[in-house]
């Protein structure tokens, strides 16, 4: 084989190797609204072995130390997440992963499990990757690396955003438009149905006219449910539904629970919410609405 043929053959081999590498590292976009478990397993499967010593590139030729390995691992992990459209951020001290529609909360134990498995896939010693201190270091480093200061202009924003399956409804003084989902909206929920401005439910209005015939009261009910979807409007109000038994309160509750999604509603009584040591108030965190079926005896 002459020199020209050898060069051509080598070029073909290199080209094929590059193609194989690109195919192996091609980002895979998960279905939107994937569960945290699905996101975790997918990100673990995307992790590949890396040479920590080469990346650290210590001038004395020493191996990468613990600090360097921790920083490198999280940097590489964030690259994997970004390449697979799974942006990671810190919102009010908690880790969230964007799934293409909204930001899903990743609990501490889930995050530490994920980071330990990713570290093992990146060439950590198997025992070291399972050690709680290793996972604690990675978890704390992710908090530091993924943190971005909140935009102070957000607190002055008067635009209302409501997240639906088919887009985000943007409401302001000029009107309302349905647009694409955007990670910068920082929405942490998605209502499980499409927005349809022409949708009607005659059966519901028939029920409402029977159980709550006063039109002004109907408007107040609708206004309050809409208020719960606003982020910046601080009315600091709660709504009481008064009445004897079998007057439709439980039907309203079931409708609201389905409307907002069970994962976005909690059910603390007024007594539980107002206790001096209200430890249960932690359940209000990341919820759109608290709907207490009973006031309580306090």
Please provide the spans of the model-predicted regions.
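Replication-associated primase and helicase/ATPase modules
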Residues: 1-84, 197, 201-206, 210
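Short, surface-exposed, polar/charged, turn-prone segments marking secondary-structure boundaries
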Residues: 117-118, 124-126, 198-199, 268, ...
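Conserved AAA+/SF3 P-loop NTPase catalytic/coupling segment centered on the Walker-B
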Residues: 288-298
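P-loop NTPase catalytic core of nucleic-acid-dependent motor ATPases
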Residues: 4-21, 35, 84-109, 113, ...
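Extended, Lys/Arg-enriched charged tracts that mediate electrostatic binding to polyanionic substrates
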Residues: 61-74, 129-169
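Noncatalytic partner-interaction/assembly domains of nucleic-acid and motor enzyme complexes
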Residues: 54-57, 61-113, 117-127
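Short, hydrophobic/amphipathic alpha-helical patches that form generic packing surfaces
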Residues: 75-79, 143-144, 226-227
């Amino acid at each position: 084989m002459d020199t020209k043929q050898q060069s051509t053959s080598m070029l073909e081999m290199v080209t094929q190797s590059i193609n194989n590498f690109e195919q192996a590292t091609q980002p895979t976009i998960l279905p939107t609204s994937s569960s945290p478990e699905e996101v975790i397993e997918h990100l673990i499967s995307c992790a590949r072995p890396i040479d920590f010593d080469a990346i650290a590139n210590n001038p004395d030729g020493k191996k990468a130390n613990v600090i360097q390995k921790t920083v490198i691992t999280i940097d590489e992990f964030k690259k994997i997440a970004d390449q697979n459209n799974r942006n990671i951020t810190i919102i009010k001290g908690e880790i969230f992963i964007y799934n293409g529609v909204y930001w899903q909360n990743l609990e501490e134990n889930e995050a530490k499990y994920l980071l330990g498995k990713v570290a093992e896939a990146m060439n950590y010693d198997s025992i070291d990757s399972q050690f709680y201190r290793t996972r604690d270091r990675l978890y704390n480093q992710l908090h530091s690396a993924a943190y971005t200061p909140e935009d102070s202009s957000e607190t002055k924003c008067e635009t209302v955003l409501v997240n639906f399956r088919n887009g985000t409804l943007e409401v302001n003084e000029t009107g309302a438009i349905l647009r694409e989902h955007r990670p910068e909206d920082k929405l942490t929920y998605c209502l499980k149905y499409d927005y349809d401005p022409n949708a009607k439910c005659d059966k519901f209005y028939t029920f409402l006219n029977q159980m709550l015939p006063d039109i002004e009261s109907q408007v107040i009910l609708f206004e309050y449910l809409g208020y719960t979807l606003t982020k910046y409007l601080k009315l600091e109000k709660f709504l009481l539904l008064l009445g004897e038994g079998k007057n439709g309160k439980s039907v309203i509750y079931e409708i609201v629970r389905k409307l907002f999604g069970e994962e976005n509603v909690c059910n603390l009584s007024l007594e539980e919410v107002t206790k001096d040591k209200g430890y249960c108030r932690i359940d209000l965190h990341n919820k759109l609405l608290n709907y207490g079926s009973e006031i309580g005896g306090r």
